[in-house]
A protein has these predicted regions:
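Non-catalytic, usually N-terminal nucleic-acid engagement modules in DNA/RNA processing proteins
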Residues: 1-83
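Catalytic cores of enzyme domains
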Residues: 73-261
Length: 261
């Protein structure tokens, strides 16, 4: 099978199994992640970037649980697509593996679970899926910021896509203005501490605080956590695997629109 035919088949497999967009780039075009990719899959030559779209209604809903539910689904769909592509390529004789953008993550030092093996936003831009927005997120032509990403690393030599020549973001700054904690300042800059404390308010740091409260003498603050909303939210995080609590920058992007064909 030719390189082009193999690439087309890999992409169609992704699109048939939950992906809405697929791009390809050579491992050499991700030099920042070269060592990590080699650790994950020695001899990897290509990376496929997979995007699955959100429901726009869910992102903009006043009921946050709809956006959370849809986030779980979007990640599941991208994961299903990635695994389907990896299995297809292995049937063709190429070592291949799906790589998450969300969880599971490497919890060891120095990252401590705060970053994935590959920056899929960066990979998405270089694979021609979109361009950077003022928030630093990937903005696609088709779905704006309303996508979730993951991908595949493979020893197959696939035909790479080219980065877009156009800038998809119109730099309206609505994502920056929508941020409730002023973590976004434009130009792709993101105060990750401010953003993380808000969007992951019931994530690991909250759990760590909860455990510390159990080890220490009970305080009024800890009692409020146990008796109030905090423990219920923490339980839900464990049950669903989702700990996103803010979708403002995604939902306000004017490029995020209904995918009417």
């Amino acid at each position: 099978m030719t390189e082009l035919k193999l690439t087309e088949k890999a992409k169609s497999t992704a699109l048939e199994n939950g992906a809405d967009l697929v791009g390809v780039l050579n491992v050499k075009n991700l030099p920042e992640h070269g060592e990590r990719i080699e650790r994950m899959l020695p001899g990897a030559r290509s990376v496929l970037v997979i995007a699955s779209r959100h429901s726009l209604a869910s992102l903009r809903s006043g009921a946050n649980e709809l956006a959370q539910f849809d986030t779980i689904q979007a990640y599941n769909e991208s994961a299903m697509a990635a695994h389907a592509v990896a299995r297809y390529l292995e049937y063709q004789g190429f070592f291949s593996a799906g790589v998450p953008a969300f969880i599971p993550l490497d919890m060891d030092e120095p990252g401590k679970g705060m970053r994935g093996e590959i920056c899929w936003r960066r990979a998405g831009v270089r694979a021609g899926l979109g361009s950077y927005g003022e928030s630093g997120a990937l903005v696609t032509k088709e779905y704006g910021q309303a996508v979730r990403l993951c991908g595949v690393v493979t020893t197959a030599g696939l035909s790479p896509d080219s980065p877009l020549e156009e800038d998809v973001c119109d730099h309206c700054m609505r994502c920056v203005e929508a941020c409730p904690v002023n973590a976004l300042t434009g130009g792709g800059k993101n105060n990750k501490k401010l953003c993380g404390d808000h969007i992951f308010k019931f994530g690991f740091r909250y759990f760590q605080k909860f455990i510390q409260g159990m080890m220490d003498e009970p305080t009024d603050e800890f009692r409020k956590i146990v008796q109030g909303n905090g423990l219920r939210q923490l339980w839900q995080t464990f049950m669903t695997g989702n700990y996103y609590y803010c979708f403002k920058c995604q939902s306000q992007c004017p490029a995020t629109r209904l995918p009417v064909k």
